[in-house]
């Protein structure tokens, strides 16, 4: 039995990640495809993260970074097991978000990556570009929904993309929604059909 693919959607806030994940789940109906999003706010760490994001509690930046990281590690075994059982996972945000947001707040990218080192490695990361309209919409109730901060996050994402150690697919914000939906579907189908070898380890 071939293993499943780990396919991650990344991008700035309000770039359409969840929408595109749901499009995939609807357009490729299968009992071998599951959706997972981060942070998972139902766990102990997830509830602490939710309190922070909704401004109910404050933590220093180092604690915040570790909380997000721990939240992903809580699901590392689950992800590994699902992939080995032939289940493809469509993941809304992953370690790259954690590193980009932490680095945008001044943390060392190298240190932030070390916390995530060893997580299951994605077979594909789809990065959704944000147009000026989407970026300017990044003003909201949650703590990171700030235009200036989101621009800093974008620069950190670009650094990771340029490293070339992960298979990134960048989706332009200029595509019409129906074109974007079809393009992403085809990219995901190809990734599922071409996945080979054991699950890798991220940043090892």
Swiss-Prot record:
Name listed for the protein in its UniProt record: Thymidylate kinase
InterPro entries: P-loop_NTPase, Thymidylate_kin-like_dom, Thymidylate_kin_CS, Thymidylate_kinase
Pathway involvement of the protein, from the record: Pyrimidine metabolism; dTTP biosynthesis
Coiled coil ranges: none
Reaction(s) catalysed (UniProt annotation): dTMP + ATP = dTDP + ADP
Gene label: TMK
Source organism, top-level taxon: Viruses
Family: Belongs to the thymidylate kinase family.
Entry keyword set: ATP-binding, Kinase, Nucleotide biosynthesis, Nucleotide-binding, Transferase
Gene3D superfamilies: P-loop containing nucleotide triphosphate hydrolases (3.40.50.300)
One Gene Ontology molecular-function label: dTMP kinase activity
